[in-house]
Amino acid sequence: MKINTQDLLKAGVHFGHIARKWNPNMRPFIFMKKGGIHIIDLSKTISKLEDACNALKKTVKNGKKILLVGTKAQAKEKVFVYAKSINMPCITERWLGGLLTNFTTIRKSVKKMNNIEKMKKNGTFNTLSKKERLLIDRLYAKLYKNLGSISNMNQIPGGIFLVDPNKEKIALTEAKKLKIPVFAMVDTNTDPSNIQYPIPSNDDSSKSIDIILRFVSEAIKHSISREIKNSINKKL
Protein backbone atom coordinates (compact mmCIF):
# COMPACT_ATOMS: atom_id res chain seq x y z
CA MET A 1 0.00 0.00 0.00
CA LYS A 2 1.76 3.14 -1.23
CA ILE A 3 1.71 6.23 0.94
CA ASN A 4 0.91 9.38 -1.03
CA THR A 5 0.48 13.03 -0.14
CA GLN A 6 -3.04 13.37 -1.60
CA ASP A 7 -4.49 10.67 0.65
CA LEU A 8 -2.89 12.27 3.71
CA LEU A 9 -4.23 15.70 2.70
CA LYS A 10 -7.77 14.35 2.29
CA ALA A 11 -7.58 12.84 5.77
CA GLY A 12 -6.37 16.14 7.27
CA VAL A 13 -3.13 14.62 8.55
CA HIS A 14 -1.37 17.96 7.97
CA PHE A 15 -3.45 20.01 10.43
CA GLY A 16 -1.56 20.71 13.64
CA HIS A 17 -2.54 22.60 16.78
CA ILE A 18 -2.86 26.32 17.47
CA ALA A 19 0.64 27.73 17.03
CA ARG A 20 0.95 29.02 20.61
CA LYS A 21 0.50 25.46 21.91
CA TRP A 22 3.36 24.02 19.89
CA ASN A 23 6.33 22.04 21.15
CA PRO A 24 9.56 23.61 19.80
CA ASN A 25 11.02 20.13 19.21
CA MET A 26 8.43 19.71 16.44
CA ARG A 27 10.03 22.54 14.44
CA PRO A 28 11.69 20.18 11.88
CA PHE A 29 8.29 18.69 11.03
CA ILE A 30 6.33 21.94 10.60
CA PHE A 31 5.83 23.28 7.08
CA MET A 32 4.22 26.64 7.87
CA LYS A 33 1.82 28.56 10.06
CA LYS A 34 -1.59 29.38 8.55
CA GLY A 35 -4.42 31.18 10.31
CA GLY A 36 -2.67 30.72 13.63
CA ILE A 37 -2.43 26.95 13.12
CA HIS A 38 0.72 24.97 12.41
CA ILE A 39 0.71 22.90 9.23
CA ILE A 40 2.68 19.65 9.29
CA ASP A 41 5.17 18.93 6.49
CA LEU A 42 3.66 15.82 4.87
CA SER A 43 6.91 14.90 3.14
CA LYS A 44 8.34 14.41 6.65
CA THR A 45 5.22 12.47 7.65
CA ILE A 46 5.66 10.07 4.72
CA SER A 47 9.37 9.59 5.46
CA LYS A 48 8.79 8.91 9.17
CA LEU A 49 5.78 6.68 8.50
CA GLU A 50 7.86 4.57 6.12
CA ASP A 51 10.62 4.29 8.75
CA ALA A 52 8.07 3.22 11.35
CA CYS A 53 6.44 0.67 9.05
CA ASN A 54 9.81 -0.89 8.16
CA ALA A 55 10.73 -1.18 11.84
CA LEU A 56 7.32 -2.69 12.64
CA LYS A 57 7.78 -5.30 9.91
CA LYS A 58 11.13 -6.35 11.41
CA THR A 59 9.67 -6.54 14.91
CA VAL A 60 6.77 -8.73 13.82
CA LYS A 61 9.10 -10.85 11.67
CA ASN A 62 10.96 -11.71 14.88
CA GLY A 63 7.74 -13.09 16.35
CA LYS A 64 6.97 -10.13 18.60
CA LYS A 65 3.59 -8.52 19.23
CA ILE A 66 2.87 -4.80 18.82
CA LEU A 67 0.63 -3.28 21.48
CA LEU A 68 -1.67 -0.60 20.01
CA VAL A 69 -2.88 2.06 22.44
CA GLY A 70 -5.58 4.69 21.91
CA THR A 71 -7.93 5.62 24.75
CA LYS A 72 -9.21 8.98 23.43
CA ALA A 73 -12.71 9.01 21.97
CA GLN A 74 -11.59 9.53 18.35
CA ALA A 75 -9.15 6.61 18.52
CA LYS A 76 -10.90 3.87 20.53
CA GLU A 77 -12.91 2.18 17.81
CA LYS A 78 -10.21 2.59 15.15
CA VAL A 79 -7.52 1.06 17.35
CA PHE A 80 -9.75 -1.85 18.33
CA VAL A 81 -10.80 -2.68 14.75
CA TYR A 82 -7.30 -2.49 13.28
CA ALA A 83 -5.72 -4.42 16.17
CA LYS A 84 -8.30 -7.18 15.77
CA SER A 85 -7.72 -7.35 12.00
CA ILE A 86 -4.02 -8.13 12.54
CA ASN A 87 -4.43 -10.18 15.74
CA MET A 88 -2.49 -7.71 17.86
CA PRO A 89 -3.24 -6.68 21.47
CA CYS A 90 -4.65 -3.24 22.17
CA ILE A 91 -5.74 -0.91 24.95
CA THR A 92 -8.74 1.33 24.26
CA GLU A 93 -9.99 1.80 27.81
CA ARG A 94 -8.05 3.14 30.79
CA TRP A 95 -4.39 2.15 30.88
CA LEU A 96 -3.77 -0.12 33.87
CA GLY A 97 -0.73 1.08 35.81
CA GLY A 98 1.95 -1.62 35.70
CA LEU A 99 0.58 -3.21 32.53
CA LEU A 100 4.15 -3.41 31.24
CA THR A 101 6.33 -2.84 34.31
CA ASN A 102 4.35 -5.37 36.38
CA PHE A 103 3.48 -7.67 33.49
CA THR A 104 3.78 -10.91 35.49
CA THR A 105 0.92 -9.87 37.79
CA ILE A 106 -1.16 -8.61 34.86
CA ARG A 107 -0.60 -11.89 33.05
CA LYS A 108 -1.95 -13.82 36.06
CA SER A 109 -5.19 -11.82 35.80
CA VAL A 110 -5.38 -12.59 32.08
CA LYS A 111 -4.96 -16.31 32.82
CA LYS A 112 -7.75 -16.07 35.40
CA MET A 113 -10.01 -14.53 32.75
CA ASN A 114 -9.06 -17.23 30.21
CA ASN A 115 -9.76 -19.96 32.77
CA ILE A 116 -13.27 -18.60 33.34
CA GLU A 117 -13.84 -18.74 29.57
CA LYS A 118 -12.69 -22.39 29.56
CA MET A 119 -15.06 -23.18 32.45
CA LYS A 120 -17.96 -21.79 30.44
CA LYS A 121 -16.99 -23.77 27.35
CA ASN A 122 -16.43 -27.14 29.03
CA GLY A 123 -19.55 -26.96 31.20
CA THR A 124 -17.82 -26.64 34.59
CA PHE A 125 -19.42 -23.23 35.08
CA ASN A 126 -22.93 -24.74 34.98
CA THR A 127 -22.16 -27.11 37.86
CA LEU A 128 -21.60 -24.18 40.24
CA SER A 129 -24.24 -22.66 42.50
CA LYS A 130 -26.19 -19.61 41.35
CA LYS A 131 -24.29 -17.41 43.82
CA GLU A 132 -20.90 -18.70 42.63
CA ARG A 133 -21.86 -18.14 38.99
CA LEU A 134 -22.94 -14.58 39.77
CA LEU A 135 -19.65 -13.79 41.53
CA ILE A 136 -17.61 -15.31 38.70
CA ASP A 137 -19.63 -13.42 36.08
CA ARG A 138 -18.93 -10.14 37.88
CA LEU A 139 -15.22 -10.93 38.11
CA TYR A 140 -15.11 -11.91 34.44
CA ALA A 141 -16.88 -8.72 33.32
CA LYS A 142 -14.34 -6.61 35.23
CA LEU A 143 -11.36 -8.57 33.92
CA TYR A 144 -12.63 -8.57 30.34
CA LYS A 145 -13.26 -4.83 30.30
CA ASN A 146 -9.66 -4.10 31.28
CA LEU A 147 -7.79 -7.07 29.84
CA GLY A 148 -9.93 -8.69 27.15
CA SER A 149 -8.11 -6.92 24.34
CA ILE A 150 -4.67 -8.13 25.50
CA SER A 151 -5.58 -11.78 26.12
CA ASN A 152 -3.27 -12.80 23.24
CA MET A 153 -0.25 -10.92 24.66
CA ASN A 154 1.73 -13.72 26.32
CA GLN A 155 4.91 -11.72 26.77
CA ILE A 156 6.17 -8.14 26.86
CA PRO A 157 5.43 -6.64 23.41
CA GLY A 158 8.22 -5.96 20.94
CA GLY A 159 6.86 -2.48 20.36
CA ILE A 160 4.08 -0.14 21.43
CA PHE A 161 2.10 2.16 19.12
CA LEU A 162 0.51 5.26 20.67
CA VAL A 163 -2.11 7.39 18.93
CA ASP A 164 -1.47 10.32 21.29
CA PRO A 165 1.62 10.21 23.57
CA ASN A 166 0.33 13.21 25.54
CA LYS A 167 -2.81 11.24 26.41
CA GLU A 168 -0.93 7.99 27.03
CA LYS A 169 1.83 9.32 29.30
CA ILE A 170 1.83 6.35 31.68
CA ALA A 171 2.09 3.89 28.78
CA LEU A 172 4.97 5.91 27.33
CA THR A 173 6.78 6.04 30.69
CA GLU A 174 6.45 2.29 31.22
CA ALA A 175 7.63 1.49 27.68
CA LYS A 176 10.67 3.76 28.05
CA LYS A 177 11.53 2.20 31.42
CA LEU A 178 11.60 -1.26 29.82
CA LYS A 179 13.31 0.05 26.65
CA ILE A 180 10.40 -1.07 24.48
CA PRO A 181 10.49 0.71 21.07
CA VAL A 182 7.78 3.37 20.88
CA PHE A 183 5.94 4.19 17.65
CA ALA A 184 3.58 7.16 17.86
CA MET A 185 1.56 9.79 16.07
CA VAL A 186 3.06 13.12 17.15
CA ASP A 187 1.03 16.30 16.73
CA THR A 188 2.58 19.79 16.87
CA ASN A 189 2.02 20.00 20.64
CA THR A 190 4.00 16.80 21.33
CA ASP A 191 7.67 16.27 22.18
CA PRO A 192 8.98 13.85 19.51
CA SER A 193 12.34 13.43 21.25
CA ASN A 194 10.72 10.90 23.61
CA ILE A 195 9.65 8.67 20.72
CA GLN A 196 11.92 6.30 18.77
CA TYR A 197 9.60 6.31 15.75
CA PRO A 198 7.63 9.57 15.67
CA ILE A 199 5.06 10.03 12.90
CA PRO A 200 4.23 13.77 12.51
CA SER A 201 0.44 13.82 12.15
CA ASN A 202 -2.88 15.17 13.35
CA ASP A 203 -3.81 12.99 16.33
CA ASP A 204 -7.20 14.63 16.94
CA SER A 205 -9.01 13.82 13.69
CA SER A 206 -10.61 10.37 13.35
CA LYS A 207 -9.82 10.38 9.61
CA SER A 208 -6.17 11.15 10.26
CA ILE A 209 -5.96 8.47 12.96
CA ASP A 210 -7.66 6.00 10.62
CA ILE A 211 -5.27 6.46 7.70
CA ILE A 212 -2.13 6.25 9.85
CA LEU A 213 -3.44 3.09 11.54
CA ARG A 214 -4.32 1.67 8.14
CA PHE A 215 -0.74 2.01 6.89
CA VAL A 216 0.66 0.67 10.16
CA SER A 217 -1.67 -2.36 10.20
CA GLU A 218 -1.00 -3.08 6.50
CA ALA A 219 2.75 -3.16 7.22
CA ILE A 220 2.23 -5.57 10.11
CA LYS A 221 -0.17 -7.73 8.08
CA HIS A 222 2.32 -7.87 5.19
CA SER A 223 5.07 -9.07 7.53
CA ILE A 224 2.81 -11.71 9.12
CA SER A 225 1.73 -13.02 5.67
CA ARG A 226 5.33 -13.26 4.52
CA GLU A 227 6.33 -15.21 7.63
CA ILE A 228 3.44 -17.64 7.16
CA LYS A 229 4.47 -18.22 3.52
CA ASN A 230 8.10 -18.76 4.52
CA SER A 231 7.03 -21.22 7.21
CA ILE A 232 4.90 -23.19 4.73
CA ASN A 233 7.71 -23.25 2.14
CA LYS A 234 10.16 -24.61 4.72
CA LYS A 235 7.81 -27.51 5.46
CA LEU A 236 7.36 -28.42 1.77
Predicted regions and their residues:
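N-terminal cationic and glycine-rich segments that engage phosphates or anionic surfaces
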Residues: M1-K65, V69-N122, K130-R133, M153, ...
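Conserved beta-strand segments of the P-loop GTPase G domain that flank and frequently precede/overlap
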Residues: I40, V69, L162-D164, M185, ...
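Short, surface-exposed acidic/glycine-rich loop or hinge patches that mediate macromolecular interfaces
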Residues: A73, P165-N166, N202-D203
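Long, charge-patterned amphipathic alpha-helical coiled-coil/hairpin "stalk" segments used as oligomerization
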Residues: I86-I195
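Short glycine/threonine-rich loop/turn motifs
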Residues: A171-S225
